[in-house]
Amino acid sequence: MRVMAPRTLILLLSGALALTETWAGSHSMRYFYTSVSRPGRGEPRFISVGYVDDTQFVRFDSDAASPRGEPRAPWVEQEGPEYWDRETQKYKRQAQTDRVNLRKLRGYYNQSEDGSHTLQSMYGCDLGPDGRLLRGYSQFAYDGKDYIALNEDLRSWTAADTAAQVTQRKWEAARVAEQERAYLEGLCVEWLRRYLENGKETLQRAEPPKTHVTHHPLSDHEATLRCWALGFYPAEITLTWQRDGEDQTQDTELVETRPAGDGTFQKWAAVVVPSGQEQRYTCHMQHEGLPEPLTLRWEPSSQPTIPIVGIVVGLAVLVVLAVLGAVVTAMMCRRKSSGGKGGSCSQAACSNSAQGSDESLITCKA
């Protein structure tokens, strides 16, 4: 089974942007739902976070003093009280549905009531530069392992094990994939367009990377060349090393793109080279904020100082996100889009699990 990549949420549509509008590059919206049971300590904790591209814009935590959908970006704060009331009710319904689903899944896997278990989901959509759907997602996981996922065709499911196959058969009989596809091709796309327009000064900006190459001797015979990209947005970037024009991907150490803590990102790629041959190696960088690809070499006369503070901040943020990611892999309850102002999941749909229907795993989107 393919690896599921977590990320996503959704709201009520008040107006669609024209299909002719274009944006630089592709954009994405992801919602992540996580429910963690805690036997003997009350109801499961439910957390939802939503992202547009690399920017978190909404959050809900059932453990908050007054649980509500909370804005996490200035451009979503302009949504009115009714919007936030709908979001809050949606999350509260989802929390209750997940409570039932956790109990059902525990039965599927013949687990006792003593241990803590985690139900996670991710859903959302990607748009191309023309504002049209590139890819839709609806993925679920249980206890950190894949459970079931909507395939790229948005018409079929991939189940991870025999328990998930039971869910798959029920969903196929109920034509759940059609409901998911209608949402992903409809409301998901429309809301992402809306957010991109409302937050265009932030979401559609392109900040080029600050670049340099550092040299780190390993011995008398070898050294590490590290190519740095700092302070860039959006997060998508390409770093490669070449030796005499030949790609060195197999020998390159490449870290994941990391948040810098200020809304930008950082990344580096390193290669070990024979001492004295450093000038044969070039770092090649491509990013939306660059007018053209960059080619960099180590300059022995100007060894730059590595900005340790910025790196430490980025690592700290990465750790926080990693912890959150461990609490968020991909499992939830969502229902079909109802059009108009009801959103895409009704109270009745979210409570189906009480009657034993696996349709309730489909996530609530409004």
From Swiss-Prot:
GO terms for molecular function: peptide antigen binding; signaling receptor binding. Residues 25-308 are extracellular. The chain crosses the membrane at residues 309-332. It is a single-pass type I membrane protein. GO terms for cellular component: early endosome membrane; ER to Golgi transport vesicle membrane; external side of plasma membrane; extracellular space; lumenal side of endoplasmic reticulum membrane; MHC class I protein complex; phagocytic vesicle membrane; recycling endosome membrane. Residues 333-366 are cytoplasmic. Residues 115-206 are annotated as: Alpha-2. Residues 25-114 are annotated as: Alpha-1. Residues 207-298 are annotated as: Alpha-3. GO terms for biological process: antigen processing and presentation of endogenous peptide antigen via MHC class I via ER pathway, TAP-independent; antigen processing and presentation of endogenous peptide antigen via MHC class Ib; immune response; positive regulation of T cell mediated cytotoxicity. Gene3D superfamilies: Immunoglobulins (2.60.40.10), MHC class I-like antigen recognition-like (3.30.500.10). SUPFAM superfamilies: Immunoglobulin (SSF48726), MHC antigen-recognition domain (SSF54452). It is found in: Membrane. Disulfide bonds join 125-188, 227-283. Residues 299-308 are annotated as: Connecting peptide. Residues 209-297 form the Ig-like C1-type domain. Heterodimer of an alpha chain and a beta chain (beta-2-microglobulin). Involved in the presentation of foreign antigens to the immune system. Belongs to the MHC class I family. This is Class I histocompatibility antigen, Gogo-C*0203 alpha chain. It comes from Gorilla gorilla gorilla. The lineage of its organism: Eukaryota, Metazoa, Chordata, Craniata, Vertebrata.
